[in-house]
Each structure stands twice: as structure tokens, then as C-alpha cells.
Amino acid sequence: MKKQIVITAIIALVGSSIHAVSAQQTNVGVNSKAPAKSSNGDVAQSTTVNDPADTAIDVETIEAAMVSAVGLGKPRNNMSSVMIIQKKDPIGQQNLGRDIPFLTQSLTNVITTSDAGNGIGYSGIRVRGSDATRTNITINGVPINDAESQGTFWVNMPDLSSSIGSLSLTKGAGLSTHGAGAFGATLAIGTETNSPEPYYQIDQSVGSYGTLKTTLKGASKPIKLSNKETLYINARLSEILSNGFVDRATSNLVGYQTSIAYEKKSQKPQGQNTNQAGMEQLSEYIKRPKKYNTNTTQIKFLAFGGRETTYQSWWGVPIEKYNMGLNPDSNHLAALQNHYLRNTGFSGATYRNSIDSANLFNSNPNKYNYYTYKNEVDNYQQHHQHLYLTHNYTSKKNNQKQLAATLYHTFGTGYFEQFRYGDAFSKYNIPPIRMAADSNITVLLSASDLVRRRWLRNNLIGVNLHHTISVGKDWWIFGLGANQYYGNHFGQVTQILALPNPSSFKTHEYYRAIGNKSDVNAFVKYNHSLTLGRNNNTRGGVYIDMQLRKVNHVGSGTDNDLRNFDFKGNFLFFNPKAGFQLQHATHHHISGYVGVAHREPARSDFTDNPNGAVPRPERMINGELSYLSTFPALPTLNGKSSDNHIRINAYYMHYKDQLVLTGAVNDVGTPLRKNVDVSYRRGLEFEGQYVLWQKDYAVANHSHFERNYLHLIGNLSVSQNIIPNSKVAWQDYATGIPVDTVYKNAPIAYSPNRVAALGLQGQIKKWNVLWLSKWVGRQFLDNTGDVSRSLNPYKFSELTVNYTHKFRSGTSLAFKAQCINVFSARYVSNGYTWGYMYGSRDITQEVFVFPQAPRNFLVGLTWRFSKG
């Protein structure tokens, strides 16, 4: 029932005091210099090269263990996929209420969008043109993508960013993982780890368009059950309110998270302290692995989720209406009138009454919302429960091992409500209703304005098992996962407004359908470390990753339009992957990767497929070749710095039977797709950082160092995204027969050939500033390459400022502010289209777009009270 959103890519060099430089499909750091510490305890602008000989299991937290098993392999020596990792504090500095996709805008080849226009509500990301169904999302290793639609709906998990310990994103086929697996990008999320001290925190943000965010969170003092056993408890409660930029696009979101964790350690790791480094261990490539001599056991229960009520804004703005905001001249008015005349005056017309007409012609062209009914809302709640177990131990042969298991359950229920104008009862299998016209006359009512609700109720139950073994220079992970999904779709007519007492109408169910899906997968990952060269100055490794996945998906019943359907999809996929990484003389890194990925069709591919075609599963062969150079020392304004780098990545993604977006959407806003025989994406990605100025200084009686700096950061992607033979069927409404047209070398929809970002990132003592400018090339809305059905190139800029003051008592106060779309650029970042013929070969097209807000602001305060 949810509208598809998109989310993908690699976390870029954003945040106040931490960046991890890495190469796609490698896992190497960039500097042997000891890191300076920032005021928030993060590693500031410095990382180190891993020692490939270090293969001990060093993941101490449950969250790190689960992310490591399915997303990274070994965190400090994983040859299979290296990504840039964004840690908690940089996330928090940008977390003023906007959805998670907008925390990732600086990423290479990434596009973000918002239906409401201000980043709250339904939001999404695309990477390399890939949509949400290609992005595998996991939270502590648990699959989050909806099993049927394959998308991820962040609005169902309000303010999840306030509970994140890390985000790690990669592009391409990635690694074996649970759930549907990556088909374009991978996002592995780790939640916050156990707090070593008690605290409570209040976050309050306000901003444009009535935005108000309140977050309360805290942790208890660790409860010592014995010298070896500890109990941890933490919780969060959040509320986000917004009116949206688009008319009536309100959001009322409530989210929560709570956890209780048990930890038993019989001995400290040798040579290390026992501070809770949490998920930071994954991004700080600077510590020797911990060697465990005794057992460590952790058990944790995590619950999170929320409730969302959002007014629908997924219809978009007709392009003729949007153009009126640019220049309301007679030509644009005539175009809008023609659009209106094409879509009114017949059964099922878009514009059904005087309210629709007045709304179309009189509303603000930039903020137009098709929906006017006061309760045209999406009302949904989703609840997740996870139970984790990890056990680290040393075998008799002194091999490091880890067992990990996760049980999980996701429950969701809700509906969206719709007002329908003059609908015939026959559409709902409602017999005519006899009612009194006056005291002597009765009439037979067969049509009326009415209110309906379309429901989704679903459950997902699953288990993940992992066994990790470290033997010398070899590293093994064995994984097994299984889950079962149960979905119920049904619709109800709740009110018939022509009745004297509409609410007296007994709720009538007019359709019901089920969808059940099972997913079983098993994988093995093997890494082998290498040391090469006369002086052993070339290090690296090779890896192989193999997965077998079995999917069974069945659906049957009646759809919203009373069509009966019954589909079955049984798939068996083998997904092998392999690669290498080499590091020479500290400053040169090269890596290569090739992987195969498969993806089954989603529910809507079966139920909404054009012309009744049976969708086929997709296959992708992904190749990546990456070079990373970290310069030993380059001049800055006040000396030299070794924290500069440049990365060049070449990729090729070859598809067989890719399900590409057609540009059209169904009646709940889900993008429609169809198979194309052969297609490909290929491109070059450039990322870099240059240190303009930096200075380290000692604080707190030289107890630690902090770094002031000013960095120039940027990225650029240049790509081709092509369907060699794109066959489009245009419906001819005069004959009722579709007309096939083949477009040669057509660009894949929603896949711009150019995406770039440039920014300045600086920290001066308690102040942190980030300026980011983003450029996005033309996006075609269908697979024809017709400019009239495309989104114009656009650019925007953002400014984020943070100030943090810590008191001796341990209390801290942080001020955060964002200016979004600084220059008030007028642009649209998303849209959809469809076209048809009527007795001739001329194509009549309808294009709808989603405008983004002009200059707007968010400001916030964070009070954190903890032991000093």
C-alpha cells in the first residue's frame, strides 16, 4: 500500500570530525599517522592501514557482530566490499527532523527526493539510477525491505536516525546478506550500542512549514549482576510534526526504540581497554584486533517502530500547472486548460467536480496537491522486535570463533483513506440501496460519493544464524537465514455520503487478497590475506563469496479494481562473488570485484504488469575496479597535511531481464516496471578531499588532542545507462489495441548521466560547518529518451552549522542549524509519466512532477545530561 521510495549508495565524506577514506570493493585505511581526537571522541581526519595478517575476531558488540556477518565480513580486513562509514555524531549533527535519505545527500551518484517537498514524510534516494527495490536494507543484519514490494518506507520508522550507531553503504551487487540481497546498493545500519554510563537527552528542533521534532532518550546506569555480568537498558521516544511544503502534505509521526542487553565477560581482551567503542570499531581502522582468551556472551532484545499519519501527496503536480509558476502567460494557461479538458467529463476522470477544478486553477503552482478531502491520509504503524545472541570463544587450537543468532518479528497494520466522487456501487459489489426521497417516494440509489479505506496487515518472522572462524590468515563466515511473510490486503467502504446518516452504513468489504512469501538463503564467505613484494611492502587479499537463495512467493484474491488474480513465483538463485585488494607502500590501493546478483519480481510486477505479461526474475553481473591514492603530504595554508586523497572507481552493471521503471504509477503511487531483455549501466566515479587548513591543539591538561580543519570535498559521476532496444507499448484508445514502438539506445528512466557535489567542511573548536552544493543531470521519466518527458537538470546548496559546549559536570549543550536550498532554486527531483494514442500516431502525454521547497530553515537544541 505504500508508495515506493528509493534508497541507495556509499556514505560520503560528511560529518564534523570523522571521515573514513576507502575504495569501492576494498577495505583499506589511508594513513599510518596516529589520529587526533575530536571533542566528541571520534577519530578526526586520520585512519590507518590494516595489517592483513591480523585476523582475530574483534567485534565486541552485538550490533557490530550482526552488521559484520551480513554486510562487511571481517571489519578490519574485509576484501569483499569497503565502504565509507558514517558514525553517530555526524548523523546527529544533521538530524533536525528530515528523513534518513536527506542525511546522505553528499554521496557520489546519489539523488534524494521528497513527496511533501521538505524532506519529511515519504522520501527516497536513488543511486546510479537504482530505486528502493534494488537497495537491500538491514538493521543489525535483519532485512527491513518489505517482502512483497521490496521497498523500504522510512516513514514507518520515525526518527530512526536518533538511534543509529552507524550507517555503511556500498554500491553494486555487494556481499551476501539476508533478505532479497542487493541489486544496486546496500545499506547496513547498526543501532546504538550499550552506553557505559547513564544519561538522558532532550532534542528539540523547529523549522519552516510547521516542522517540530521532539526526541527524549536515555540509558540507565549499567547494572552489575556480578563481576562478569552486566545489564544495560536504554530507550527513545520521538515525535515529528510537519505541515509540508506541498499543500496539506502534513505528517504526524511517533517513533520509539527500547533495548535491554545482557553481557558476560570472563576476562578483558588482551592489550585493550573495555570501553564501549560500539559501531565506531567499524570505522576506526586504527586499533590492533583484540585477542580473546576466554568466552564472551551477549544477549540483547531490541524493539523499535512507530506510527505515521501522513496526508497524501503522491499524486504530484501536472507539468502544465507547474509551468504556470514559472511564467503564467496565455500559452501556459492554454496548456493547463488542455490538460484539464483531456482529463475531465468522463467516467473515471481525474477532475470530477468543481472542487477539483477550482483546486487545479486557483492553487499555488509550486504547492498544488490534487487531494482535497480532509482525511485523505495514510495511517500505518509498524513494530519490530529483535532478539540477538553472540558468543565469542577460542578453540583448543587457539582459533578465534564466533556464533551469532537473531530471531526477529515485524508486524504492520494500517490503511489509507480515500474520498470517491460519484462512484458506482457496482465497483464495490454493493447492491442498489432503496432510500426515501420524501414521505411518499423512494428511489433506488446505485452511485454516490463515498469513503473507502484500503488496508494492509502483515507479519514477517525470521531467523539468522552465523558462524565465524579466524584461522591464521584465513577468515570464514558461514551464514543461514530464513523468513516467512504473511500479507493481507483488503478494502472497505466505510461511508456512503448520499445516505441521510452516512456513518450508519455498515462497513462493506469489497476486496481481499493474500500474499505469502518464504525466503531461505545460505552463504559462505572466505577471505585470505596476502603479503607480497621483496620487502613485504604490498599487502592485500583475495576473497570468494557464494550464496544460494530459494524464494517462494504466492498471491491470490481480488484486487482493488475487482480483478481476480492468482500468481506463483518459485525461484532458486546462485549468487557467486569474488575479488581482490592490494595496498602498496601505504599510499596506493587497487581493488577489483565481480559479482552476480538475482532478484525476483515484486508483487506489483505480477498484479500490475502491462498487458498481462508474466514478469521474469532479473540477473545482474557487476564489475568494479577502483584506485585510491592517499598523498603523503601536500601543502595547506599553514603547512602540510597527509589527509588528502582521491578515488577513481569504474563500474559496469550488465542486466538480463532488468525490471525497469516505465515512468507510470499505479493507483497507490507504486512505480510500475517491466522486463527489458538487455540493459546496462557503466560509468566512472570520482571522489576527493583536499585539506585547505588544519591545526591540532591539546586540551584538558593535554589529556587529548582536538583538530581544527577546513576541507574541500567533492565527487563526480559520469555514466551511461542504456537499453539498446526499448520496446514501449502505447495504448490506442480509438482501437483498443496497443501500438509497439522500439527506441534504440534509450536511456534508462531516472538515471542521470551526470551527478556532482562540492563542499566545504570545517571545524574550529566548538564550531562545525558544512557547505554542500549538488548538481543533478537530466532524468528521463520513461525509457524513450524524449526530452518532453524528463526532469530538467537542477542544482541546490545547503549550509549546516553546529556549536557544542561541554560543561565540567558532564552536561553538554549543542546548537544546530540548517539553511536548505540556500538560493531558493526552483526545481523538481522526481516525477512520473504516461502516454497514449487516439486514432493517430501522435502521442498524448501526461507528466507529473514533485517540486522541492525553496529556501527553508531548521534549528535545534540538544541537551545531554550525563556523568562527567
Residue ranges of predicted features:
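Conserved C-terminal beta-signal and adjacent last beta-strands/turns
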Residues: T8-A9, T296, F304-E308, N375, ...
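N-terminal periplasmic "start-of-domain" segments of outer-membrane beta-barrel proteins
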Residues: A23, G41-D54, V59-N95, G124
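Extracytoplasmic beta-strand/coil segments of soluble accessory domains associated
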Residues: P101-P143
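Short acidic/polar hinge/loop motifs at secondary-structure boundaries
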Residues: P143-K171
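Short strand-turn segments of transmembrane beta-barrel domains in outer membranes
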Residues: K171-S176, A185-P222, A235-A249
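Face-selective signature of the C-terminal outer-membrane beta-barrel domain
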Residues: Y380-D559, Q581-Y593, N638-S641, I646-A650, ...
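Membrane-embedded beta-barrel scaffold of Gram-negative outer-membrane proteins
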Residues: N392, Q402-Y408, Q583, H589-G595, ...
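Gram-negative outer-membrane beta-barrel transporters
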Residues: L532, P635-S641, Y652-H654, L672-N783, ...
